[in-house]
A protein has these predicted regions:
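Glycine-rich, proline-tolerant flexible connector loops at the mouths of alpha/beta enzymes
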Residues: 34-40, 51-74, 105-113, 175-184
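Hydrophobic faces of well-ordered beta-strands that scaffold small-molecule active sites
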Residues: 27-33, 58-60, 82-86, 104-106, ...
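N-terminal amphipathic alpha-helix/helix-capping segment at the start of soluble metabolic enzymes
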Residues: 1-32, 125, 288
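Alpha-helix-loop-beta-strand connector modules within alpha/beta enzyme cores
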Residues: 65-86, 119-131, 193-202, 286-288
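Hydrophobic or amphipathic alpha-helical targeting/insertion segments
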Residues: 91-132
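Glycine-enriched alpha-helix->loop->beta-strand junction motifs that scaffold or abut catalytic
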Residues: 77-80, 97-104, 125-128, 195-201, ...
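Active-site mouth loops of central-metabolism enzymes
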Residues: 24-42, 61, 80-88, 144-157, ...
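Catalytic alpha/beta core domains of metabolic enzymes, predominantly
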Residues: 136, 144-291
Length: 361
């Protein structure tokens, strides 16, 4: 893949459990459970499924002391770093760290007095647990809204840095910053601004992005703009839907930007009057079929035997459909003709026997 990205290569390295972020380490995918954290079994089952899908870091809501204590048992049964999401009650942050949280997410502005923030920081310092300082456009301080005549990227950055300075003044800098907005361009601008002013790792995402359809579009555009500039160390695709879909989308975004390998990429033509088969159905079946195949290749699914071979040239392997008969294509060359009803099975067999060392690019 031709390289056009800029790199923010001075990012501070932060250890989160068994993972490192920043300093040129790979961008990690994060999601958040939607189970009741107090329900250990349900939460563990969901996390294990997310792990299998490619989730690198998982965050759990900790609204109660029971949830904080549940982290200890959850932690024993999972294999990725566990982040505790804390609001308002500093005691929950302390309990979460005491029960195995690898990182905590707080907003110092709603934790309370300096003494309470210090109590949290002291435990984090003692255990060397990173703190993610999060700000959100929906809760920007009134004085900053007034100062900037509304919710702006500049206001979000000032809010984030103010909160970071509170913790720095307490002698701690094991920090990650997140700035979230549902406004894509505001979010992108805020990340550009803060990347110029600090070397802390940044967790990136478009908050309240929406449903699977609209949320994926907003997240892909927003994350694409930000990541293309070399900004971002962890990402989350926030969707109103199953966390598993967040991870799938995040993997696809990183792969599309050339930031992560692995996983089959399916390309297919948009259909036209020359389409001779049920291409939509076939393409969907192929995409479902390849979800769990760990090959780093491109598969083309084309709708006619006239233009299909040419359009599939950039793919490693492809199929093109025709009336009653289709084509199997490798490296842009027609390998053989295949009965139409055997196209999917033929492709599956080829992928199962694929030799990655002979991948044609």
């Amino acid at each position: 893949m031709e390289e056009f990205r800029m790199y923010r290569d001075h990012t501070k390295v932060i250890q989160i459990g068994n993972k490192k972020i920043g300093g040129g380490n790979p961008i990690l995918i994060q999601s958040m459970t939607n189970t009741k954290t107090e329900n250990v079994q349900a939460t563990v089952e969901q996390i294990l499924a997310l792990e299998a899908a490619g989730c690198d870091i998982i965050r759990c809501a900790v609204p109660t002391m029971e949830a904080a204590k549940a982290l200890k048992e959850i932690k024993k049964q999972i294999h990725i770093p566990l982040v505790a999401d804390i609001h308002f009650d500093y005691r929950l942050a302390i309990a979460a760290m005491e029960n195995g949280a690898d990182k905590i997410r707080i907003n110092p502005g709603n934790i309370g007095s300096t003494e309470r923030i210090k109590a949290v920081v002291d435990v984090a310092k003692e255990r060397n647990i990173p703190i993610r300082v999060g700000v959100n456009s929906g809760s920007l301080e009134k004085e900053l809204v007034e100062k900037y005549h509304g919710v702006t990227a500049e206001g979000l950055v000032e809010s984030a840095l103010d909160k970071v300075h509170i913790i720095e003044e307490l002698g701690y800098d094991n920090l990650v910053i997140s700035i979230k907005s549902s406004d894509v361009m505001m979010c992108a601008r805020a990340h550009e601004l803060i990347a110029e002013q600090t070397s802390y790792p940044l967790h990136v995402g478009i908050t309240e992005a929406g449903t699977l359809y609209s949320g994926n579009i907003k997240s892909a555009i927003g994350l694409g703009i930000i990541l293309h500039q070399g900004i971002g160390d962890t990402i989350r695709v926030s969707l109103t839907g199953a966390p598993l879909e967040e991870v799938k989308s995040a993997r696809r975004i990183l792969k599309t930007l050339g930031l992560r390998k692995g996983g089959v990429e399916v390309v297919s033509c948009p259909t036209c009057g020359r389409t001779q088969i049920d291409l939509i159905g076939l393409a969907n079946k192929v995409e479902t079929m390849v979800q769990d195949i760990p090959l780093d290749i491109k598969v083309a699914v084309m709708g006619c035997v006239v233009n299909g071979p040419g359009e599939a040239k950039e793919a490693d392997i492809g199929i093109a459909g025709g009336v009653g008969v289709g084509l199997l294509i490798k490296g842009g060359e027609i390998v053989k003709k295949v009965p139409e009803d055997q196209l999917l099975d033929t492709l599956r067999e080829e992928l199962m026997n694929w030799d990655s060392n002979k991948t044609q690019k």
